[in-house]
Curated annotation (Swiss-Prot):
InterPro entries for the chain: RecX_HTH_1st, RecX_HTH_2nd, RecX_HTH_3rd, Regulatory_RecX, WH-like_DNA-bd_sf
Keywords: Cytoplasm
A GO CC term attached to the entry: cytoplasm
Organism: Bacillus mycoides (strain KBAB4) (Bacillus weihenstephanensis)
Highest taxon listed in the record's lineage: Bacteria
Keyword Cytoplasm (UniProt): yes
Similarity comment: family membership: Belongs to the RecX family.
Pfam family, one: RecX_HTH1
Record carries keyword Disulfide bond: no
Compartments, as annotated in UniProt: Cytoplasm
One GO term of the biological process aspect: regulation of DNA repair
Coarse class of the protein's main subcellular location: cytoplasm
Name under which the protein is recorded: Regulatory protein RecX
């Protein structure tokens, strides 16, 4: 039988205690526990403990240690159930202890995937202007159930998606001033797909660009690229020269009519 001979507070933490024991060969350091474990098991000087009781004490101490690690991890931001499990596995915590810790965290409402998903959707839509597809993918990667994700995305109605998509279009199109209107639309389309917006939202938003088409900007872009290709292919003569310029400008999204007008203007310039 093991007897507790001394209990002393650790110097670095007043909530942890060193337990000294005697197994019949004199006093020795036995183990350390958190204050809650000390009180839960009624540990005190002179208490006799057998191997089974000692095993329970040490197991509960490991659970408490992992629980406090999880609480510390949660103190920075909300986490999902899977994120807590992954965090504890990296700390080399056993699965039985992880299950017990997660169960306690759920009971104490420190983790709640439904609340997490709603908060995540609001942040990603309002702050980062992410589309629902990217948001869903992000939540799935954090272990949130598909049904919970679908419910949480109700916080992100189509009207808000379109508002965000139009905001991104307005913000990004300024960087495509030297592109043809068609090429600008293609690049904006690609950007919105990467951001996670659905095809129908993208089409509706890009349709609004038709009314905003800037002919002056289109001409500036045509002249910018046209003059560049004029220089690039000037070593060629006649039909070969014009054909290469036409193909290059067509790939940039300019219409045949626009290209022909540009080439005619260049001929007149001499």
């Amino acid at each position: 039988m093991t007897v507790i001979t001394k209990i002393e507070v650790q110097k670095r933490s007043k909530e942890r205690f060193n337990i000294y024991i005697d197994k019949g060969q004199g006093e020795e350091y036995g183990f350390s526990v958190n204050q809650s474990i000390l009180m839960k098991h009624g540990l005190q000087k002179g208490l006799e403990i057998d191997e089974v009781a000692l095993g329970n004490i040490l197991y509960n101490e490991e659970v408490q240690k992992a629980y406090l690690q999880a609480i510390s991890y949660l103190s920075y931001q909300m986490r999902t159930k899977q994120e807590i499990e992954d965090f504890l596995r990296k700390k080399e915590v056993g699965q039985a202890i992880i299950s017990e810790v997660v169960s306690k965290l759920l009971h104490d409402r420190y983790i709640n995937d439904k609340e997490y998903a709603i908060s995540y959707v609001r942040t990603q839509s309002n702050v980062n202007q992410k589309g629902p597809t990217v948001i869903r993918r992000g939540l799935l990667s954090k272990g949130v159930q598909d049904l919970i994700i679908t419910h949480s995305l109700q916080e992100y109605p189509k009207e808000k998606q379109m508002e965000n998509a139009l905001f991104l279009i307005e913000k990004k199109k300024k960087s495509y001033q030297k592109h043809s209107f068609l090429q600008m639309k293609l690049k904006l389309d690609e950007m919105l797909v990467r951001k996670g917006y659905s095809r129908d939202v993208i089409q509706i938003c890009l349709e609004e660009l038709k009314d905003e088409k800037d002919d002056e900007q289109q001409q500036e872009a045509l002249h910018y690229h046209g003059n560049k290709y004029y220089e690039k292919y000037k070593k060629y003569d006649g039909w070969t020269f014009e054909n290469k310029v036409k193909q290059a400008l067509y790939r940039k999204g300019f219409s045949i009519d626009e290209i022909d007008i540009f080439l005619q203007m260049k001929r007149e310039e001499g």
